[in-house]
Amino acid sequence: MPAITLPDGSVRRFDGPVTGTMVAESIGPGLARAALAMEVDGALVDLSREIADDASVRFITRKDDAALEMIRHDTAHVLAEAVQSLWPGTQVTIGPSIENGFYYDFYRNEPFTPEDFPAIEARMREIVAANARFEREVWPRDEAIRFFENRGERFKAELIRDLPESEPISIYRQGEWLDLCRGPHLRGTADVGSAFKLMKVAGAYWRGDHRNPMLTRIYGTAWRDQKELDAHLHRLEEAERRDHRRIGREMDLFHIQEEAVGSIFWHPKGWRLYTALQDYMRRAQTRGGYQEVRTPQLVDRALWEASGHWDKYREHMFIATVEDEDKTLALKPMNCPCHVQIFRHGLRSYRELPLRMAEFGACHRYEPSGALHGIMRVRSFTQDDAHIFCTESQIAAETARFVRMLAEVYADLGFESFRVKFADRPEQRAGSDETWDRAEGALIEACRLAGVEYEYNPGEGAFYGPKLEFVLRDAIGRDWQCGTLQVDYVLPERLDASFVGEDSARHRPVMLHRAILGSFERFLGILIEQHAGRFPLWLAPVQVVVASIVTDAAPYAEQVAETLTQAGLVVETDIRNEKINAKVREHSLARVPVILVVGRKEAEDGTVAIRRLGGAAQEVMSLADAATALAAEALPPDLRR
């Protein structure tokens, strides 16, 4: 006789095993209509799942986040059924829900294209309208393998073979169609609703291995209602408008070419943006008590073997051999082992700790060409990397100090808020469980003492220690994980780093790995999209354009440009024999924040007409006042404080 405890604390008792549907109906017809699934003792399950023992139950309705994930998962199943009904013989593989949508991978001799989407979506809507119920069945393993093999579904059969022997083989039916799936699912296909859309196709290797067959991945998005779908599509349009690759072309910031895949050719304007950010970060680190260093890019494999990176990271490293010397070198994928070498060079005392060591370190990591994306995902990049060598008792103070610095930097760059995630031990890791217990405990205590609130991101720590991940939200609601702080007891042990303590004995330092931007390249991509290329004056690649209205004003335009340049501004002149409206349009497209318009009258009066990006009004000022005001506005925020 199960007793069901509801979220309000009330208890309902039943004479025998009950399903979630039965419990909802006992509460009222409104809940029975609204409930899509349920949590039983915290586990999300189908409404049809039987409850035989006492349990706490919470019903999931359409407004819950869990419902949205289930809508997306079920839409993937509807997609798979639609594809197989339209193209018999197509093999299905996997189809999970993902952020903002879902995908399903298919194996077919002829790949799908976006031209197939209208037919697929029409068939999907028919399946939704039919409202086939989702029904869970548990099959014997051998029977399930035979069934899928007989249907020519070799990928599904392989998945079943690889499941642990203890795991039940759950099959979900929706009408005549079925799929291998753990669930849970909604009540029926009608619960998916109509707020879905297929978005794109891509290639994907089976199980992510290039030695396996190439599959066609169809991506889609699904939402609770049409309003949410329309809002998402609008965000995508806005993301397209802000795409750093397009803006980079329009502003002449950088380019990428086949001869250097994954590496960036920075143009003069782009490099001005890069160095403005780097100079700002250098000042921030100097104020924060960091010492800047520089370490080699090519390092012998012996160091990577000692650090553990050779075993864990070799497939992502670029390797070079020196035949005459019988050496194997690697371009460094990260800076930390090299920083330990500087720490080890000479005798260190506890009086030197905490020792904060920073480097704008050039790193190289292999990424498959299909994973590269503009300047946001590349093979060669520069990190704002730093390592703090400290004692265990100093971790909390250094954590608090770093978080304050990070918050100030993000605010200066236009990001007012961020979230913190605590990433604990991954499955593949270095060090003993005892060491990880110690590191995780130290970081948790540091967060408590520093007043840092966080959410858990289980299993996502670095292979040598737990970490805090700092997540920015941009102007259109996207999250970007940029900053990190990692506690590492492993690398100092592996690389034999030590200091002489107050007791005159040798001790291991704790190593805090930290970054604020992550990589300059990726962060600049985020920054371009955050501002849609409309940078604050201090970051703008070209801060001011002086545009002449008539040819007679050209000498004065040059004089204005020289005055502004002497005031420290980055200035270009436009004295072409073109109409002023055409000049304004061109420089507005290039997102120049300030255009100074000068003609005969301005030349006679010693004035300039100031036009701001995106504005139609002009403000007339004397040249001296304009130079003073713009120079003050162009100061980086840290130099104004």
Curated annotation (Swiss-Prot):
Keyword Nucleus: no
Subunit structure: Homodimer.
UniProt record similarity statement: Belongs to the class-II aminoacyl-tRNA synthetase family.
Cofactor(s) named in the record: Zn(2+)
Broad class of where this protein is predominantly found: cytoplasm
Chain's role: Catalyzes the attachment of threonine to tRNA(Thr) in a two-step reaction: L-threonine is first activated by ATP to form Thr-AMP and then transferred to the acceptor end of tRNA(Thr). Also edits incorrectly charged L-seryl-tRNA(Thr).
Pfam families, per database record: HGTP_anticodon (PF03129), TGS (PF02824), tRNA-synt_2b (PF00587), tRNA_SAD (PF07973)
Coiled-coil positions: none
Region feature (Catalytic): 243-536
A single GO cellular-component term on record: cytosol
Entry's Gene Ontology molecular function annotations: ATP binding; metal ion binding; threonine-tRNA ligase activity; tRNA binding
UniProt cross-references to SMART domains, sorted A to Z: tRNA_SAD
Listed HAMAP family: Thr_tRNA_synth
Organism superkingdom: Bacteria
Protein name: Threonine--tRNA ligase
Boundaries of every TGS domain copy: 1-61
Compartments reported by the entry: Cytoplasm
InterPro entries: aa-tRNA-synt_IIb, aa-tRNA-synth_II, aa-tRNA-synth_II/BPL/LPL, Anticodon-bd, Anticodon-bd_dom_sf, Beta-grasp_dom_sf, TGS, TGS-like
The UniProt record lists the keyword Cytoplasm: yes
Record-linked CDD domains: TGS_ThrRS, ThrRS_anticodon, ThrRS_core
Alphabetized UniProt keyword annotations: Aminoacyl-tRNA synthetase, ATP-binding, Cytoplasm, Ligase, Metal-binding, Nucleotide-binding, Protein biosynthesis, RNA-binding, tRNA-binding, Zinc
GO BP term, pick one: threonyl-tRNA aminoacylation
Reaction(s) catalysed (UniProt annotation): tRNA(Thr) + L-threonine + ATP = L-threonyl-tRNA(Thr) + AMP + diphosphate + H(+)
Recorded name of the encoding gene: thrS
